Amino acid sequence: MIKYNKGVRDFFKNDSPKLYLLSGSQITTDINLKDKSRIGYYWNIFAETWLTINRLEDTPQHPYRTIIVEHCINHVTIKDIVNTYKHSGFWGTNRKNEALKSFAEIFKQEQIKNKVYPLLEFE
């Protein structure tokens, strides 16, 4: 699972900030399949990212959306997130791995549903 999640972590560390800049610093969830340019593809991937984040579970037991937004995008430490939920450090690490896995699965489903090709694979 760690290797599988490495691709998602790298996506949020390296690609997501670049996509945000390419989008003109706008958060969008609009898919435009008519724009076949490379920028259009990246715009759609960025929209897919936010569609996926909005579909993530966000309950006290599985705060996946909170973990992805706060840790992967806003760079809040897992320790600070864990303190919010009054749990131990291992709880946070386990939830983070589950959140990354859930993100990858839902992201692939969203890409197929919205016909955004080629599929982005997290290795």
Residue spans for each PLM region:
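Residue-level detector of well-ordered alpha-helical segments, enriched
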Residues: 7, 63-64, 95
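Charge-rich, solvent-exposed alpha-helical interaction surfaces
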Residues: 11, 84, 99-102
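Short, locally clustered residues in the helix-turn-helix/winged-helix DNA-binding domain
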Residues: 54, 69-73, 104
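Short amphipathic alpha helix immediately N-terminal
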Residues: 59-77
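DNA major-groove recognition helices of helix-turn-helix
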Residues: 92-110
